[in-house]
């Protein structure tokens, strides 16, 4: 299935690229989420007319993400949780908790943007957490977990 990408897609291509993908990936993900359109002659012509508008929109999204990344780089978030004597938490700190703490401190972050590669935080201490704001922009935030 041949498609034209309407935005940058990780491991696939950039805005305006013609790509060949498996039919299921195109029908179930790229087309419904508005990330691509079928590469027909009419759609190619329509895309070329809208290219400047789409490129400006993509540049605005990236600039917004870079601004948020600069704000996050200066930020250190403290989360209080109940813990046992040895520093092991009763429960865990997940992406939702970190996103809520970052939003409360003034920077809007969705839980899907927070990356915890080793799973949830289950101990008291300081952790560096990656926040994936855009396909090209990633920030690191220091999260301090203290016992209540």
From Swiss-Prot:
Pfam families: Ribosomal_L9_C (PF03948), Ribosomal_L9_N (PF01281)
UniProt cross-references to PROSITE patterns, sorted A to Z: RIBOSOMAL_L9
UniProt GO cellular component terms: ribonucleoprotein complex; ribosome
Classification via Gene3D superfamilies: Ribosomal protein L9, C-terminal domain, Ribosomal protein L9, N-terminal domain
GO molecular function annotations of the record: rRNA binding; structural constituent of ribosome
GO BP terms, alphabetized: translation
InterPro entries assigned: Ribosomal_bL9, Ribosomal_bL9/RNase_H1_N, Ribosomal_bL9_bac/chp, Ribosomal_bL9_C, Ribosomal_bL9_C_sf, Ribosomal_bL9_N, Ribosomal_bL9_N_sf
SUPFAM superfamilies, A to Z: L9 N-domain-like (SSF55658), Ribosomal protein L9 C-domain (SSF55653)
Keywords: Ribonucleoprotein, Ribosomal protein, RNA-binding, rRNA-binding
Job description of the protein: Binds to the 23S rRNA.
The family this protein is said to belong to: Belongs to the bacterial ribosomal protein bL9 family.
Record PANTHER family: 50S RIBOSOMAL PROTEIN L9 (PTHR21368)
Cited NCBIfam families: L9
Record-given protein name: Large ribosomal subunit protein bL9
Native organism: Pseudomonas syringae pv. tomato (strain ATCC BAA-871 / DC3000)
